[in-house]
Amino acid sequence: MRMLRALVGRPKKRQITSSEKDNQPKPSQSFVEGSSSPDFPDGVEVLHDCPDATVDICFVHGLTGDRITTWTAQGQYNPWPKTLLPSKLSKARILTYGYDAYVVRKSVPGSNRLIDHATNLLNDLTTDRVLHNAASRPIIFVTHSLGGLVCKKAILSSRNSPDAHLRNIFNCTRGVIFMGTPHKGS
């Protein structure tokens, strides 16, 4: 955590002007399009694209979170990785990954399984990196809570995959930042 703070510092809260409010889409409008469900935006979203990137940084949210609001400060419209990191890490492509992280919906237990989320992360991220000619680019994961477990399982699945293109995630992973991940259960 100290390394991340040293890298980006703490975001300062600022007031949003009325013209900024009018010109910026609300998160619910900007990232739900194309999602499989309006309840949660899933898959990979590029927060900052850099044509000559030397590293990908992928944020993976935790339990009951989503790929945008988990990383967005109260009163802000954009997530801090999108607003802060490009100025500090100019050669990084910033990604976020979303999945249905709700255990219970309307008093009905969810059927989501860790391995399913991990498989989707591995497949979606591999596809995105191939489409952006980034399959061999180093990648760093920043994870929170359940997202850390999803990420670990995806990396292990990548390592053990018989498919070379899926093994690239394992081979290119340079680090994982775990924040509040229950490695030994909750």
Residue ranges and their predicted role:
Residues 58, 95-97, 175-177:
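Hydrophobic/aromatic beta-strand patches that form the interior of the parallel beta-sheet core
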Residues 61, 116-186:
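Serine-dependent carboxylesterase/thioesterase catalytic core
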Residues 66-68, 103-106, 149-151, 185-186:
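Short catalytic/ligand-binding loop motif for oxyanion handling, primarily in non-cytosolic enzymes
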Residues 87-104:
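Conserved alpha/beta-hydrolase
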Residues 1-37:
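Intrinsically disordered, low-complexity Ser/Thr- and acidic-rich regulatory segments
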Residues 37-91:
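Short, surface-exposed "cap/lid" segments of acyl-processing enzymes
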Residues 69-75, 107-111, 153-157:
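Short coil/turn segments at secondary-structure boundaries
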Residues 63, 98-100, 182:
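Short beta-to-alpha linker loops that shape the active-site pocket of alpha/beta-hydrolase fold enzymes
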